[in-house]
């Protein structure tokens, strides 16, 4: 049977178009790479309810903490921002972050050596990640959480981000317990540092799928550095931040194994698009081999078990590392990092 001339012409045109497209794009696979920090309009449309709940919850808890602190009533007017009344802050010499007193932080569930070892209040490991030392700490921490958390939730979904956030907070608190002193400290940065670690592992794991990698590394490093420097101030535990970062980095290799691929422009769709998508999928699967996930999971479980046993045995690494206290708090003329828990002032009037 003779093939119509028009059909032959159509087939020849399609073959010529495919050959032309293949030649013009030979050796160029930039179309299947994606920017790590993509514009919001190009990201997957997902609700970010999880990060919103985290932010709202921590704002409410900070307001409750300041209400319980009641500086105007307990410190006899030695407060900052006195116009706020009950919600005014302790003096800057006591808390440079514009927040409550040390005794209030301990009362609300902050970490302290006496509470953990003598009173066996292990529940503080769960409450400490939700507290903030002051208004400055709250703004910087939640601002960073919104930037990092929304991106991570949009890319990988709320369930995996919630697991990383909670486990990193617990791991960070356990790290902090090994270095905790009598002055109370909070570990809210641990959960956030877990997201930073997970973001870094997601970038490293899918390195060949992203462009602008140096810019992404610079952004991650900047966020890490700013939040880590804040940890040198009183009541913020940098060891918790370190523990949370390690936890998030390992859990990122375990859980974040599905990066989003950018689709080709409509004019590039067809069999060639399917072939290149298969190539990208094979590349992704090369990074997603279960051996790496299993190794990272075993390392995470080993570290978690180790710090948990050390915390239960009451190990205090400050006895073996005298300079470690400066990783957690650097004393200056403006504030002190002593082991003495600061309480609200109490004055007695003489007759």
From Swiss-Prot:
Source organism, top-level taxon: Eukaryota
Expression sites (tissue/organ): Expressed in pollen mother cell.
Keywords: Golgi apparatus, Membrane, Transmembrane, Transmembrane helix
A Pfam family assignment: Rhomboid
Main location: Golgi
Spans through the membrane: 48-68, 130-150, 160-180, 183-203, 216-236, 239-259, 294-314
Cited InterPro entries: Peptidase_S54_rhomboid-like, Peptidase_S54_rhomboid_dom, Rhomboid-like_sf
Membrane topology: Multi-pass membrane protein
Gene Ontology molecular-function annotations: serine-type endopeptidase activity
Signal peptide limits: none
One GO term describing the cellular component: Golgi membrane
Localization, UniProt: Golgi apparatus membrane
GO terms (BP aspect): proteolysis
Family stated for the protein in its record: Belongs to the peptidase S54 family.
Function of the molecule: Probable inactive rhomboid-type serine protease.
Protein's recorded name: Inactive RHOMBOID-like protein 8
Annotated source species: Arabidopsis thaliana (Mouse-ear cress)
